[in-house]
Amino acid sequence: MNRDVYENCRKFLKKYPGTIAWRVKKHASVIQRHINDDEVVLYTFIGQKDTMLIQPFFTTVIVFTNKRMLLGRKKYLGRSFYTSITPDMLNDFEIRTGLFFGSIEIDTVKEHFIINGLSKKSLGEIEDSISKYLINEKIKILKNRKETNE
């Protein structure tokens, strides 16, 4: 699978042009720096994190790899925001549709966050990708626990 996060973001935005996102190349570079050589990018999307306002300050790139979930946002003046979440920390997610845009609320053990400004057409693909990711990772976790108990 393609490891180029920016290219994956561009494909997502081309497929779903109603998604709100600014400075995509800068935000993608935050994630690109943190992807390890042995990781494979499974799914990438982009939206506005934890805000109901549509501003360039909150655009965030979300990447699912074969090992973890990554969130990255490039702030101004050289600062950046980066979060890495392992699959065992993910609980569930919720899809919401509004009048013009959709949103996804992802719940983890420590926090939950909302990604807004998503094209309503993109929600089905995002839901399918996150569901498959969660199911596959939970199966791996259960198998590992079973093997360690034996």
Predicted regions and their residues:
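Polybasic phosphoinositide-binding surfaces of eukaryotic membrane-targeting domains
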Residues: F57-L71
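The phosphoinositide-binding surface of pleckstrin homology
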Residues: E39-I54
